[in-house]
Amino acid sequence: MILTGDYHTHTPYSHGKNTVAENTAKAKELGLKELGIADHGFSHVAFGLRRRKLDNYIADCRQAEKDYGVKVLVGVEANIQGVDGKAELTEKDYEKFDLYLCGKHVFIWYDTFADMIRYGGGNFFADKFHKASEKLIERNTKAYINAIKKNPLDSVTHLNYLCPANALEVAKCASDYGTYIELNAKKTHLTDEELTSIVDKTSARFIIGSDAHSADRVGDTKSVEEQLARIAFPLERIDNIDGRTPNFRFAEYKKHL
């Protein structure tokens, strides 16, 4: 299994250690054809991309592509801000980005006060006490599904990490809307049983993302490969390996704006 592109990497514009150029240099060294710079979205309180730095962010990505000959996608890992599925990018933002990832993160500005308490707080305490109520799982599932339906997301990142949901139902929706399920190499997020169920019961497609917060982890797929081997995963369902490149929903959506 050879990675074609790594679409989930971070830089100091959010929570990463190495620059866009350093990540791109590593991608070139590994022979990757494409690299996604997907820093945390604007609503992340501590480690989010800031609008005042967006022009510099874009310029760094374009320059790195010229310097290293690797296609660099200007991306964002947006935050699901509430059960209604708000994911912080507006259509005015779309022209500035090439890649639209989205996942659940903890320390963000939520859509409403109720979302902060029931969605944000509920998941925080569920993680601390290692127990999620059926109501919370239902709420999280609704948040993921609404985010997919209401936003042209390219992938859902680290599904179920710090946000336990019905992964099968989320994957069904992702399949219907052309959104990838990310297999995240940094975080343990789907059990073997959940992933097997998704493969067997849906037509969802997948991409592998390193979620690299440093250049030395760009292109890292080790933990994902170990899980795939355990469950005899059909590699033809992964669209960023062995020469394949994803057919991203966001790019298709923007053609019709």
Regions found by a protein language model. Give the residues of each.
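Alpha-helical scaffold segments that flank or form the walls of functional sites
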Residues: 21-36, 59-69
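Glycine-rich anion/phosphate-binding loops
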Residues: 14-20, 85-86
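Short, ordered loop/turn segments at secondary-structure junctions
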Residues: 40-41, 77, 105, 186
